From Swiss-Prot:
CDD domains: GT5_Glycogen_synthase_DULL1-like. This is Soluble starch synthase 3, chloroplastic/amyloplastic. Residues 66-189 are annotated as: Disordered. SMART domains: CBM_25. It comes from Solanum tuberosum. Tuber, sink and source leaves. InterPro entries: CBM25, Glyco_trans_1, GS/SS, Ig-like_fold, Starch_synth_cat_dom. The lineage of its organism: Eukaryota, Viridiplantae, Streptophyta, Embryophyta, Tracheophyta. Pathway: Glycan biosynthesis; starch biosynthesis. May account for most of the soluble starch synthase activity in the tubers. Contributes only a tiny percentage of the granule-bound activity, but may also contribute to the deposition of transient starch in chloroplasts of leaves. Belongs to the glycosyltransferase 1 family. Bacterial/plant glycogen synthase subfamily. It is found in: Plastid, Chloroplast; Plastid, Amyloplast. Signal peptide: none annotated.
Length: 1230
């Protein structure tokens, strides 16, 4: 086995050109070990004194037990090596084996040569040859074989392998003479005592021929030591064959070889090639032939070689560190590291000169740091004092593969620090992550952590839910057991009373044979036909059961004529049921459902005791158990049905939200859209923009300005990007990469790179949500200050908006609170967790604050102790203005004193309008400066002066539909503020109006079974109101009977529907008595003339309204003006088709099937109803006639339209998104 002694660097420190002649050393052919590893070193200067200046070697020996190997070694250019003439082998014990395998060796010589040719470098090898005759011999003769042809030439680096001193069995003959004072290249003399051949590599020396310096002296010493060690007798026990077949030296020989290596290392520590050598090349082992057995002691040999290598590496490291320590000490630098080039996923040793640090008087020195600007993997460890010259302390730190720099400070473990004069210490990691890659890595780590936390939270919730389910199931089981026990007791009481009346037999009317029987016995039951009301019956049947008809009619038998002659006796055979205590029966003239005459013992039925029945106690235990099982099964079925319905509802909600988001993104497709539509974090997205539909129409250039996360992303706004023309018409496009931590993409467009005219969506900017990001949008805090809230204090639509909008925004992961007066007429049964919160004083009045949950929303109830809200009503007091003004001021004071700092304060209509100016005048500079005011107009008919003042002070203002906002834009209180005035359509509460879970309709339904559900609802409505049960078109009208609602158009539509053979149902009442009486007269007229096709219900009925929405084919809403309108939205939720006048919110939500296809497409919708323009009879006829004709002539198309409108989302999902955009726009304002 070859035991290499590798060098990590050149043994000589420098290579200086000499004037003397240099030898070019050529490889020895034929005897080079096939496992030789090449090493690049400098050419050696040949000194006249013949001393070896540097040696790299290994010792190997092949004993007679090894087969010979034919090795082909690559030759260098030049003359052939001299000497080494093959010799005949001497007698040896393994000669026959060698000869036998000679043929095999010949066939393997080619592969062995290839192995030697792996290195492209020139190799030099020296060999010590031993024979079997004398393995203990000592090398005594040294011959240097010179290559005269290569004497002249300049100094050049040559490539050679680590030189070996090897022992190998060879067949050769001695050639040449002995010269023990000089060793010549390419010649060798076999020592007769040992048979060793020595090949030495001559290292290049610095200086001229006559110059003698420390390096040359060291080289001379190495040569001397080599010579001395080769004079030592090698004992057999000092040799051990390794798994490569070579011999490893042990004992004095190995020790002296190690000393030579160390001496060489000390003399050449300044080599420039220390870091460039590939140490792995020194440790390649000889290949082992497949049929060559492994020698014993292989493990020990390998460990010894490894130990030698590690020891040499440690020496090299120590010497390099000592050099760095000396250099930094001389320069007064207190910090260095080794290795000097720090790489990722490796260890680095950090050295601190405590004497030059602020810690020079401290006994403990610690390092505290982290990687990548203190953002990754912090560490703290103690430094230890070193042996280096100077007060050097050190520690090792592992550099993670994600690092691009390390940052650290030193301290004494308490309060004394060395932080590089406040700048901290840092080390750059070469080849580490780029900063942007590390940012993405951190984001991915954060995402994984979030996923982990989410899974853990989900598991905790699952376990908690499972525990709740188990506890609830236990409670339900106990409840079922109690109920079973109670029902069994009731049955027991009844049966005992019946058993008292029951008899064993009655000879005159009936009897049983045999008289003694038990359960499951077959008996004959005889009946005397002549004794009762069936004396004239042609046939006789028994209808029977047991135990007070426990299982209903379980015995049905036809009786036959008996042979008994003392009466008209008939009989039948009956099997006594199991568990029967007594039998119950009646006689009839026919089977069930066909019998006419009965004999039921004068309405008491017949009863007969089973004489040998089971013990009663046992029966009642079993009965109670059966009742319990029945209750359990019924409960299981109920819960399964309920679970299925809940899951279906949740699925529908999710699908509806997804459709709404898609329609939200497509609603601006005529201006801008993206590919893909759903933007994913970490991917690229292309933005398409159509300037033809914007203020940038006709501009020669369009520039795209983009950022993320509401313009707050860490990367800041991206550089402006010039958009390029797209393939589709007037669109232009730009592509950007979406960061991993993006949750929103924000952009605007401009005509020039430096600005000019902007399209920023009227100050709102364009925003598109990003999905799959590691960052989530931080929640906003919105506070509604209102005087109405459904369902606890609802008067009109304002209360619905406050509750429904708040729930929708809260569902989008924002924080919502509501401040409401504590009326004495609140519906407290809808308030959960109601409790006292605090009290405070304002305006000389104590105000108590209560807290509760309403529809899942946090509500603070303000109760001033001056009695302003103890009037038994919401509106209707003479001092309503004073009451609500006080409430608005008190609400702002509550926010201030309570430490609230909401992002948005949202006030509604005239009643909470004072919040806007009170905030700006008294609170914006006193702790609530962060907040922005949003004001919503629900009804412009009341408090116009208050609304105008609120418009002036609000940051953003809205009304309940875009069209209505245009219709009122000319109003004097609105016109000056159009720049901040927006229309957002209201929504409906999908939980209140839900045909799948509506308890007021006969069959729950969705869009999948809309025809079945609406058919059943129509039939139920017709039955309830006494209308004709016929398949006719039914028009429903649900409204307040006021002139705003178009009562003259309503009357005309009723007559038109009846003329078209339809049915009409109206539900509503009039606040004006004259109008109410007018409709009472109309109802009387219609009920007398069209009693089976018209019904006017002139008082509001909530359950009936649900049934009308579900059972009607059409819902008519002919309003003269309508700010938003919820009736048409509710109608579509139930699959009814709206017929409306084009005004306000009706125009924004209903798209005519014949005229509004393009307008609907721009909103991401499909046409969904019939509409008309005028406010006269002709307009109503135009829409209503088309609707009725569609029902009559195209029923399949009409049914598909019902399904289509049911799938449209008219909840608060979309309005909530619009309000959030408005809130964000308000927050941007200074």
């Amino acid at each position: 086995m070859d035991v290499p002694f590798p060098l990590h660097r050149s043994l000589s420190c420098t290579s200086v050109s000499n004037a003397i002649t240099h030898l070019k050393i050529k490889p020895i052919l034929g005897f080079v070990s096939h496992g030789t590893t090449s090493l690049s070193v400098q050419s050696s200067s040949w000194r006249k004194d013949g001393m070896v200046t540097g040696v790299s070697f290994s010792i190997c020996a092949n004993f007679s037990g090894r087969r010979r190997r034919k090795v082909s070694t690559p030759r260098s250019q030049g003359s052939s090596p001299k000497g080494f003439v093959p010799r005949k082998p001497s007698g040896m014990s393994t000669q026959r084996k060698v000869q036998k395998s000679n043929g095999d060796k010949e066939s393997k010589s080619t592969s062995t040569s290839k192995e030697s040719e792996i290195s492209n470098q020139k190799t030099v090898e020296a060999r010590v040859e031993t024979s079997d005759d004398d393995t203990k011999g000592v090398v005594r003769d040294h011959k240097f074989l010179e290559d005269e042809d290569e004497i002249n030439g300049s100094t050049k680096s040559i490539s050679m392998s680590p030189v070996r001193v090897s022992s190998q069995f060879v067949e050769s003959e001695e050639t040449g003479g002995d010269d023990k004072d000089a060793v010549k290249l390419n010649k060798s003399k076999r020592s007769e005592e040992s048979g060793f051949i020595i090949d030495s590599v001559i290292r290049e020396q610095s200086g001229s021929q006559g110059e003698t310096n420390a390096s040359s002296k060291g080289s001379h010493a190495v040569g001397t030591k080599l010579y001395e060690i080769l004079q030592v007798d090698v004992e057999p026990q000092q040799l051990k064959e390794n798994n490569a077949g070579n011999v490893e030296y042990k004992g004095p020989v190995a020790s002296k070889l190690l000393e030579i290596t160390k001496a060489s290392d000390v003399e050449h520590t300044e080599s420039n090639e220390i870091d460039d050598l590939d140490t792995n090349s020194f440790f390649k082992s000889d290949l082992i032939e497949e049929d060559e057995p492994l020698a014993a002691g292989t493990v020990e040999t390998g460990d010894s070689s490894l130990n030698l290598r590690l020891e040499m590496e440690a020496n090299l490291r120590r010497q390099a560190i000592e050099r760095l320590a000396e250099e930094n000490l001389l320069q007064g630098i207190r910090l260095f590291c080794f290795p000097e080039v720090v790489k990722p996923d490796e260890d680095v040793e950090i050295f601190l000169n405590r004497g030059l640090s602020t810690l020079k008087n401290e006994s403990d020195v610690l390092i505290m740091g982290a990687f990548n600007e203190w953002r990754y993997r912090s560490f703290t460890t103690r430094l230890t004092e070193t042996h280096l010259n100077g007060d050097w302390w050190s520690c090792k730190i592992h550099v993670p593969k994600e690092a691009y720099r390390a940052d650290f400070v030193f301290f004494n473990g308490q309060d004394v620090y060395d932080n590089n004069d406040g700048n901290d210490f840092s080390i750059t990691v070469k080849g580490g992550m780029q900063i942007i890659d590390f940012e993405n890595f951190l984001l991915e780590e954060k995402w994984r952590e979030q996923e982990k936390l989410a899974k853990e939270q989900a598991e905790r919730e699952r376990l908690a839910e499972e525990q709740r389910r188990i506890e609830a199931e236990k409670a339900e089981i106990e409840a079922d057991r109690a109920q079973a026990k109670e029902e069994a007791a009731k049955k027991k009481k009844v049966l005992r009373e019946l058993m008292v009346k029951a008899t064993k037999t009655r000879d005159i009317t009936w009897y049983i044979e045999p008289s003694e029987f038990k359960c499951e016995d077959k008996v004959r039951l005889y009946y005397n036909k002549s004794s009762g009301p069936l004396s004239h019956a042609k046939d006789l049947w028994i209808h029977g059961g047991y135990n007070n008809w426990k299982d209903g009619l379980s015995i049905v038998k036809k009786l036959v004529k008996s042979e008994r002659i003392d009466g008209d006796w008939w009989y039948t055979e009956v099997v006594i049921p199991d568990q029967a205590l007594f039998l119950d029966w009646v006689f009839a003239d026919g089977p069930p459902k066909h019998a006419i005459a009965y004999d039921n013992n004068h309405r008491q039925d017949f009863h007969a005791i089973v004489p040998n029945h089971i013990p009663e106690e046992l029966y009642w235990v079993e009965e109670e158990h059966q009742i319990f099982k029945t209750l359990q099964e019924e409960r299981r079925l109920r819960e399964a049905a309920m679970r299925a319905k809940v899951e279906k509802t949740a699925l529908l909600k999710t699908e509806t939200k997804e459709r709404t988001m898609k329609s939200f993104l497509l609603s601006q497709k005529h201006v801008v859209y993206t590919e893909p539509l759903d933007i994913q974090a970490g991917s690229s997205v292309t933005v398409y923009y159509n300037p033809a539909n914007t203020v940038l129409n006709g501009k020669p250039e369009i520039w795209f300005r983009c950022s993320f996360n509401r313009w707050t992303h860490r990367l800041g706004p991206l550089p402006p990007q010039k958009m390029s023309p797209a393939e589709n018409g007037t669109h232009v496009r730009a592509t950007v990469k979406v960061p991993l931590d993006a949750y929103m993409m924000d952009f605007v467009f401009s005509e020039r790179e430096d600005g000019g005219i902007f399209d920023n969506k009227s100050g709102m900017d364009y925003h598109i949500p990003v999905f799959g990001g590691v960052a989530k949008e931080p929640p906003m805090h919105i506070v509604h200050i209102a005087v109405e809230m459904a369902p606890i204090a609802k008067v009109g639509g304002l209360g619905d908006v406050v509750t429904s909008l708040s729930r929708a925004v809260q569902d989008l992961n924002h924080n919502v609170d509501i401040i409401l007066p504590k009326y004495d007429c609140l519906k407290m049964n809808n308030v959960k967790d109601f409790r006292f919160h605090k009290n405070y004083f304002w305006g000389g009045t104590e105000i108590k604050v209560w807290f509760g949950k309403v529809e899942g929303l946090s509500v603070y109830f303000l109760e001033p102790q001056n009695g302003l809200f103890s009037k038994g009503c919401v509106y209707g007091c003479s001092n309503d203005g004073e009451r609500f003004g006080f409430f608005c001021h008190a609400a702002l004071e509550f926010l201030l004193q309570g430490g609230f700092s909401p992002d948005i304060i949202h006030c509604h209509d005239w009643s909470s309008a004072p919040v806007a100016w009170l905030f700006k005048e008294q609170y914006t500079h006193y702790g609530l400066s962060k907040s922005r005011i949003v004001f919503t107009i629900h009804n412009l008919e009341f408090g116009a002066d208050l609304i105008g003042r609120a418009m002036t002070n609000a940051d953003k203002a809205t009304t309940v539909s875009p069209t209505y906002s245009q219709e009122v834009s000319g109003n004097p209180v609105i016109a000056p503020h159009l720049h901040k005035f927006h229309g957002i359509v209201n929504g409906i509460d999908p939980d209140i109006w839900d045909p799948l879970n509506d308890k007021f309709i006969p069959i729950p339904y969705t869009s999948e079974n809309v025809v079945e559900g609406k058919t059943a609802a129509k039939e139920a409505l017709q039955r309830k109101l006494g209308l004709k049960q016929a398949d006719l078109p039914l028009v429903g009208i649900i409204t307040r009977l006021t002139h705003q609602k178009g009562i003259h158009l309503i009357k005309h539509a009723i007559w038109r529907t009846l003329e078209r053979n339809g049915q009409v149902v109206l539900l509503g009442s009039a606040p004006d008595p004259r109008v109410q009486n007018n409709f009472v007269n109309l109802a009387n007229q219609l009920h007398s003339k069209y009693n089976d096709r018209a019904r006017l219900c002139l008082t509001y009925d909530e359950p009936l309204s649900h049934l009308i929405y579900a059972g009607a084919d059409f819902i008519l809403v002919p309003s003269i003006f309508e700010p938003c309108g919820l009736t048409q939205l509710t109608a579509m939720r139930y699959g009814s088709i709206p017929v409306v006048r084009k005004t306000g919110g009706l125009y924004d939500t209903v798209f005519d099937v014949d005229h509004d296809k393009e307008r609907a497409q721009q909103c991401g919708l499909e046409p969904n109803g019939f509409s008309f323009d005028g406010a006269d009879a002709g307009g109503v006829d135009y829409a209503l006639n088309r609707a009725l004709s569609a029902w009559y002539d195209g029923r399949d198309w009409f049914n598909s339209l019902c399904k289509q409108v049911m799938e449209q989302d008219w909840s608060w999902n979309r309005p909530a998104l619009d309000y959030l955009e408005l809130y964000h726009a308000a927050r941007k304002l200074e």
